[in-house]
């Protein structure tokens, strides 16, 4: 075996040197002693006594001691026959435009029985540093085909906005629907309702990463993408529940590295969907516990906020590059608790949230998106004349106001009875019912473009006389209020 050495500022790193100095195993971690010049995040090759090999990454360095996390698990590793080789490289993933339409495991290896990927580059999964001054503000809308998102929580290209869900709710179905229907919306002219819907063969792509999902869920996504023709623009990464927990730490980073290549080198507008970030946070907690770190809230590590930011902040747009990365991470809140550390910290980092509601789901309303706690902080830069339609913002505000009042009236009705309500209150109750049954409720394969959704919103707002539509300017009412709802 050839040994090479690289002089470093603090010692010498031995490339190719094999060590048999395993001093301990703790969960997914292996502790080594008497290592010359180990580097933080360096990749190591581990050979077991039976000849099988595994990969790991240096998590911690203390003098000649190194703590390595093993991606494939530590079962079978001992201190007598196991050898560890330090490569001198950080973890890189091969990337190529040919990755579109392919399925990979959580480590980035093809699992669709297709040919190996011919890489056009090898990129560090931690991503490249982006000069903050080179970032451009997210603008223009990504259309999901779902009315409650497109009209009331519009997503800008380059935005990061999570779906807050819980166990038993249809977040997987919503994610698959977004993958089927998502596309770019671009106004070609000022002529009303004239748009270009680019569904992505050329410059729109989706990177989908599933972490800790069961086999049934994985098969659902694969089957849905293949049967509905969206697979050709999707790169799918699957980390199953029976895969090593530690693999969940690298799966979103490999997915985002692929997205960065497609966006910034190939000029594509990439939508990244990450599910389930709660599984990622649990994997982070497991590694932290194995390292015997001081736990933070509910046992999660104190640095989880920073760690989540290294994932979410990779969304955005860069000056001089055509592409963009938009992120929709999906979280399942334990016990429907929005104050749980994972959704709580996610909400601080991201630019809004889309809330999936159990009460709506129990009433057979799909998608059960509750618009009141939902928010898109960058919506204003994605809508309006020249991007969607000039009445978009006013219609959204009026829908929010009327729905909130309708909810208050519904609560009051439960106390005083319907007989005590005014005629105006009854209008809000009528709006509340029709809003949930016609606007929120939408078939899983029912695609509405933004103009169809806006026209449907006007149909609902015409329940009220003009005098009650306080949030819409008179000029906009003159143009849209009396118009035929089918126009």
Curated annotation (Swiss-Prot):
Non-catalytic subunit of the peripheral V1 complex of vacuolar ATPase. V-ATPase is responsible for acidifying a variety of intracellular compartments in eukaryotic cells. This is V-type proton ATPase subunit B3. It is a peripheral membrane protein. Coiled coil: none annotated. The keyword Methyltransferase does not apply. InterPro entries: ATP-synt_VA_C, ATPase_a/bsu_AS, ATPase_F1/V1/A1_a/bsu_N, ATPase_F1/V1/A1_a/bsu_nucl-bd, ATPase_V1-cplx_bsu, P-loop_NTPase, V-ATPase_su_B/beta. It holds the Pfam family ATP-synt_VA_C. Belongs to the ATPase alpha/beta chains family. One of its GO terms (cellular component) is cytosol. It comes from Arabidopsis thaliana (Mouse-ear cress). CDD domains: ATP-synt_V_A-type_beta_C, ATP-synt_V_A-type_beta_N, V_A-ATPase_B. Its main location: membrane. Keywords: Hydrogen ion transport, Ion transport, Membrane, Transport, Vacuole. One of its GO terms (biological process) is actin filament capping.
